[in-house]
């Protein structure tokens, strides 16, 4: 009797398929577009309310784009870590929007005050209009979708239950 012990089932697949990579790219692009819409909304508010933009805010904007760009890049390159990168990116983006615009960084630490200018306080304290709120909600929802999609793909990838 000759039994092979290290035989793996044929349906065990740890690599993401075309469908999963395509969905990760799509949600990353949607997230980047919503973030661009969000930043353009900041410019609209600056023009209407005569706020000033401090140069340090551009650093914050740059840092905010890094997770979504990384998630898109990993999906574009068809990396085995694309789902993990998408999950981390979604969490970072959701936390960033929540901390910056719902809680307000002035409640967390005065360190952020010089970086964020007028946006150191929450949206409610800024008396943001409906357009800004809808924009913020769209960004947070896209982050939640990125988290859920990436988590689903990552769990299926790690357990070998990925249907490609």
Where are these regions (language model features)?
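Alpha-helical transmembrane segments of integral membrane proteins
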Residues: 19-29, 55-62, 81-88, 130-140
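C-terminal TM-helix exit segments that contain a strictly Trp-centered aromatic cap at the helix terminus
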Residues: 33-42, 92-111
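Core segments of transmembrane alpha-helices
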Residues: 63-69, 139-146
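Individual transmembrane alpha-helices with interfacial aromatic-anchor signatures
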Residues: 119-145
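Membrane-interface interhelical loops and short amphipathic "cap" helices
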Residues: 37-55, 110-124
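Core segments of alpha-helical transmembrane spans in multipass integral membrane proteins
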Residues: 33-35, 55-75
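Cytosolic juxtamembrane helix and N-cap/initiation of the first transmembrane helix
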Residues: 2-32, 145-162
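Loop-to-transmembrane helix junctions at the membrane interface
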Residues: 73-104
